[in-house]
Every structure is written in structure tokens, then in C-alpha cells.
Amino acid sequence: MNSMSSGHLLSRSLLKLPMSVLVKGTAIPSNPIQDLDIDTHKPVIYALPFRSNVDLLTLQTHAKEAGLPDPLEPLMLNGKAFQRYVFIASRPTLLSSDQHVPSDSIALFSELLTEHKLDSELDVQVIPATVLWGRKPGKEGQERPYLQALNGPEKALAVLASGRDCLVRFSPVVSMRYMADTHGTDASIAHKLARVARIHFSRQKLAASGPNLPQRAQLFARLMNSPAIEKAIADEAKSKQIPLEKARKEAHDILDEIAADFSYSLVKKGDRILGWLWNRIYQGLNINNAATVRRLAQDGHEIVYVPCHRSHMDYLLLSYVLYHEGMVPPHIAAGINLNFFPAGPIFRRGGAFFIRRSFKGAPLYSTIFREYLAELFAKGYSVEYFSEGGRSRTGRLLPAKTGMLAMTIQAMLRGLNRPVTLVPVYIGYEHVMEVGTYAKELRGKRKEKENAGLVLRTLRKLRNFGQGYVNFGEPIPLNQFLNETVPQWTQDIDPMGESKPQWMTPTVNKLATRMMTHINDAAAVNAMTLCATALLASRQRALARDNLIKQVDCYLSLLRNVPYSATSTLPSESAEKLVEHAESLDKFVVETDTMGDIISLDRNQSILMTYYRNNIIHLLALPSLIAQLLIRQQSVSLEKVQATVAQIYPFLKQELFLRFEAEELNDLVLRYVAELARQGLVTVEGKTVTLNQAQTQVLMLLGRIISETLQRYAIALNLLVSCPHLGKAELEEKSQEVAQRLGRLHGINAPEFFDKGVFASLFVTLQEQGYLDDQGRCVLETAKPLSRQLYALIYPEVRMTIQESLCQVDA
């Protein structure tokens, strides 16, 4: 290629100083080599959408920071020098707008394709890169393209206004070797390459800014005139015997209560405030698997984020993370309890739309909410809702409330023209600021109503909260899910949105279980969850420091060597470092004697720590069950281990949203036993597994993770067998009473141990698994062996308490 003109060189050198002051950009992804799988040993060139020295210099800064080649350094191939960047369109001037592909770009593509023809080993990687000056979405009704070239004065204004809100987006590489091998190397291929890049750039802009935003008044007018809402207004007027105009005003007020009023400037300001806040209270935010979501956004998917709900912080954290990962903050379904001054208006402008706790007896509200949600989907705005319905008070994932999921599928039944994908999100913290309040609520204290005073009191408590985690789980493409589950679903498409086919409820329930399972699959293990799990497993909630480190190391090794899922994450530090870090969060009592440190939990902290243990209990449930069986039996055949796991697994799967299918269990048991043997906790001779007496404590503490859950199952099954005449409601009530008694006598503090809802779900699983018949009566021939097996798995003193309590119930 010919050498660069001195004019361009002079222009760039003059721009460097002002740009170093005015421009502070963010690269997306922050680590493009790893996230985009770029091979740094292969030659690289960059493709930019428009001819612009400002964009090129901004790209240069971020490419070098990321460890990529300098775009202004020539590319040497077979002794020839090539320019390392191409522009896909010329920059417009004030007088003309040339959007054609520049001839020098076509020439460069053509020459590089020729080089591939001559050298079969050559593979030049083209990295499409876009420099976005500001991410403000357009207004509805504007017909401008998403990505526009800026002339000189426009670019100067953009740099002044948005230099510190600049985004450099690197896209997945395009292999010129693949292009040459698949499509040939003639001149038309160079044009095709340019066209592909142009489409790509438009999608990048859409993914970063989102679709054009509606004017609120226009949105209201459109919805109020929709056939479904007009019909609901007429029905409301008729049923309440009020004038039509009064019903219309009621509908307008409902819409005003629900609808978001998204403001980009508030999001931009909020980003700075939240950045300060996270740096003040968290030592770091760990974000995983965001690249998967970016790809979905770029491919034009309608994204529905479905996070678990641990804290009010979740609302802010996920929007902040998405914005920083170069995506649009979603419209968030928030509980109406958060619509108080001043938080309500701020949340609303940040994208929140408000939802009442119940739609019962409010057909007008139900229709308006459904229509509003369908409008968000139709226009392509990403949406977020917490399907647990409220914050988890115990740290365990709650069964999903399925209303929003059903409305999502109903929106699809209107014939959406883009694929809809659920993105499960696991949000984890080393400290949940409301955890003390949750413990009080579980002990019977009334939930405090959200208000400005409560917010200020919470803000005063902000201090060192350790690490925060946002893990994006495996997406669930809804079109694909429906094709597999209900192949004929498209026959029920109804543009009016009134379609409620028979398959809806069972399909939504199946989807809800899959969604919650994918959230749990993406769990983040951290220092606090590991230490809480180990300390709570010891009878006195206390361990010598060395033993705590050894126990944490056992858990880490199990999770590293038998990975739970592809989306769960583990800390990279050693067990010793993790214990040190957990200690720094001031949750433990540390006492020192002549033999070393003892780390313990006081009574209050041991209740709070169950929250963090429950965040990861599902990851260790199966190895814990195997360990408990070995502790109780000392020596047992592999076949017996597999049979016991198979017998109890359906209950654990339902309660903890475990991911494995029944047919995977035998192999999984062998892998866990092999890992326990590798750690020296057991020995395997032939088909027999035997406990290593020298390592009993580690195995015992591992087994005790799941022991409270097994005690709950033992109560329910043995009550069922000894009182077969009791109905389902009575069984649930009596089980809860026995559990409360057992908790008091044996010092069990875990709030979920006495939870009526957990027992209710357990009896549903008993029926599904054939331990209860259709009338809810005990099937003794299946229930009796399981009740005996559960008794065998729990400690004798606990078994005696349960037996004594059941005798009193039976009496």
C-alpha cells in the first residue's frame, strides 16, 4: 500500500493532545483477546465504519491497552507492508455525504485476499471496531439510521459533549482465510466483506443504545386506543356501572402508575454515582459470561433478564453492570412498594415500571399491564423481572412466581417478529445489607414498609461489603423452548393477545423450573459462602483455623475437580487466602490460645451465616449426601451409594433446583467418590467404599451440610408412614411442629428448617414420585423403605427426638 499522506500524519499529531484531555473511553469487552478468542500470533487488521482520524486515534489507544497491534503500525506480510485499518464508508463533509465504500478500502481487501490465494497458511483476522460517541437512544418517529457518520463540526461537538462517554466496541473476528476458502478471492468478495461489516456496525450501535425511545404521551395514546384496552375499559364501565369517561381516566391513571419514563441523562449521571458507591462499599465486582449476552443483543434478540433476588441492591447492580458491559439498561419490573418519594421517580427514569403484588379482582389493571409489557417486547426494549416475586429471606432460591413468565409467552403469541431469549442471572454478595432484617422477619417481626428514612438508614450502614458477583447463566431461547415443548404453539398466535391455550400453564411451570435451575447453575462461590458452610457444619459453630482451611480446601477441590456446571464460578485463591479474606469482613469471633486460633460464630451470626451457606448448598448437596452415607455406614458398596442417591435425589432436585437428570447420577456418584478418594477421605477397593478413619472430621463436616435437609425429609416420611390417616394440610402442619421442636432441642438455627412452604413443596414431590396416591394417601410399600433409609442417614440422637415427637402426634 502507498505511504500515508503527510496531511493525515499532521492532522493526527495535532489531534493527540486535545484528545488526551477530552477523551476517556471504555473498551467493550475490556479483555477482547480472551473474550473474542483473538489469536495474537495471526496477523490483524481493523475495520472501522467511517473515515475519521479521531476514531482511529481513539481505537489506537484502546487496542494498545488491550495488548492488540497498533492500528497505525503497518502490517508486514511476505515482505510487503499493508495498512492495518480500513474504513467501510467515507466521512461526510458539510456539503456532501458519501456513504460508498472507499476505493482504497476495497483495494486493501482485494490485495489481502490475493495474498491468501498465494499463501495457503495465511489467515488475516479482521476485527470490526466501532467508536460510539455517547449512547443516547433516538426518539421514536426519527427516521435516521442507527449509526450515522459525523462531519467535522458534528464530530467536534460529539467529542466535547461525549468524550468521557465514549465506547470502543471490538467485535468477533472475521477470518479472511475462511472468506477466501468459502467465497473465493475476486473483487466482489471485497465488496461483500464491506457489506457484512456495515450491517455489523449498525447492530453494534443498536445493542449499545437500544431502540428509539417513545414519547410518553404518544405511548399512552397508542395503548389507550388499543383494541384490548378499549374493550377492558368498556367492561370496567359496565361491571362497575360508571361512565365510560371515568373508566378511561382510571385506565390512564393505571398506565401512569405502571409506565417507566426512561431518561438517558439520568442513567449517565446514575452511572457515576453508582461507580462511586460500589467503590466505597465493595472491594470488587466480578462479572462473568457477559459476552454471551452481548452476542444475543447484537443478533437482535429480545432479551428478558431473570435474576435471583437477594437485595434491593440488585436493581441498581444489574443495570450498572449491563451499562458498563456496553449494553442497554433494561426496563425493570419493580414492586409497587418501591414507588415512594424520592426513590420512585428516580427508579422510573432509570427504567423501572411498577407492578402490584396481585392482579386478582382487577381485570382492567391486568389488561393494561399485559398490553404495556407486550409493547415493550414489540419495540425491542430489554426487560428485567425478579421471578421469585420478592427478595429471598433465607439465601435459597425461591420457587418462581409464574405470572410474568406467562405474560412473556402471551406477548410471543401476538406474533413478535424477533426471537425472545431469557437470560438467567445469579447475583451474589459476600455481604447482603438486609440480612439482619431478614432474620428478624423470619422470627416474626413485621416487614418494614419501604420509605426514604429506611433508605437513609441503610445508606449509613454502607461499609466494607467484600466482593459482589454478577454471573450470566445459560440463556433459554423461548422460541426454541416452545418448539420443543409445544411444537404446534404458532397455531395459537392471536394479535389481540387474548389467547390462553390449554398448554400454557404446564409449559410455563416447566419453563419456570428450567429458568431457576439455570440461575442456580451460575452460582458464584466465594470466601464467605465457603467459610459459612464449614463453620455451620461444626456442632459448636467453631473450628481451629487449620481445620477451617482444610475444610474449605475440601470444598474447593470437589468443586474444581468435579465442576457443577459450565456457568458456576470459583475463586482462584487458596483456601488459606480465602479464610483470611472472610475474616477481614468482621463476621467471625477469633480467639487465640497456646495451640493457635479458633474461629467461631456467635449465636446471632450463626443465624445470619445460614443465608450465605444457602447460596451454595445446592453445589455441595450430592457430595454431602455421599459423605453422610459413608459417615453413618463406615463401609458401603458403590451400588448402595448409587441406589441411595437415586432414591433421595428427586427431593433435592425439586427443593434446590439441581441440574442433573436421573440417568446422569450413577456416573456422577463415581466421579464424586473418586475425588473423595483422591483427597484421602475414603478408600475404594473393588466395589466397596470405606471411610478413612484418620480423616473423619473433614468427611463428617462435608456430610453435615445436607444433614438438616435429610432430617426434614425424615420427619415428613416417618410422619406419613406412622399417621397414614392424616390429610396433606395436616401432614404439612404436623411436620412443621415436629421440625420446630427438633430445632429447639438440637440448636438448629436455619430459618428454612421450619418453613411451611418447604414442607408444602416436599409433599408435592412425594405425590409426583408415587409415595402418595391421587387422593393424597400414603403408599406404604414405597414410603416405608424410604422412611427407613432416611432414619439410617441421620444421627441417633436426632432420630430419637423425631420418634418421640411422632409418638406424641400419633397419640
From Swiss-Prot:
Presence of keyword Chloroplast: no
Protein name: Glycerol-3-phosphate acyltransferase
Residue stretches spanning the membrane: none
Motif HXXXXD motif location, chain numbering: 308-313
Record's subcellular location: Cell inner membrane
Cited Pfam families: Acyltransferase, GPAT_C
Sequence similarity: Belongs to the GPAT/DAPAT family.
Organism whose genome encodes this protein: Vibrio cholerae serotype O1 (strain ATCC 39541 / Classical Ogawa 395 / O395)
PANTHER family associated with the record: DIHYDROXYACETONE PHOSPHATE ACYLTRANSFERASE, GLYCEROL-3-PHOSPHATE ACYLTRANSFERASE
Protein topology in the membrane: Peripheral membrane protein
